[in-house]
Amino acid sequence: MVFYWATALYFVIVHGQRSKYSSVLVKNVLRNQIMYTPIYLIPFYFYPTPHSSWNAFWQLPGIVLLTDMIFYSTHRYFHHNKYLFTRVHKYHHTMDDPQYAPGALNAHPVEHIFVNLLSTVAPLFIVKANLYVSLVWTAAASVNVVVAHSATCENDAHELHHKYKAYNYGAGPLIFDRMFGSYKIENLKH
């Protein structure tokens, strides 16, 4: 949460980002983080893993690949399942301003669990990441989601997802979008 809000505040303070939905977006993001972060932490208590620099070396690329695969799959499913889109995922697209970084995790609680948290946490257990790798990954994922919703850097792919809704479902390298034909890029003028 610290890395998420530090990055989000950077875009609000330094870049002057504003949204007509800011109070609602911030409230929804805080609700999701406060309600579900403890659930996210429970498995780490019961599932300690050994610390090894060598393990960290191969775990991070595996985590990136698995996160992209899980996020792509669940996110695309939420788009293509009419019930899930209209009752759950549309919530993110309806009130979301893709250029307002603090609202990046504005999501229905069901989506937050099955898309956002699952894609961030499951890879850690699949590769048996140690606590340090898990903390680094969680911080990196938090910064990544905020930057993807900030209208800065090279996040046109995610902004196009919000514009067209049928492209760029993945997070990060968009490997699975490229593999399955849902990758779209065009230069957006900000």
Regions found by a protein language model. Name each.
Residues 1-124, 170-173, 177-190:
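Non-catalytic, topology-defining segments of multipass membrane proteins
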Residues 61, 97, 142, 159-163:
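Generic preference for well-ordered secondary structure
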Residues 76-81, 152-162:
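A cytosolic-side transmembrane-helix exit/cap motif
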Residues 104-159, 174-175:
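Hydrophobic transmembrane alpha-helices
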Residues 161-171:
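Juxtamembrane transition segments at transmembrane-helix termini in multipass membrane proteins
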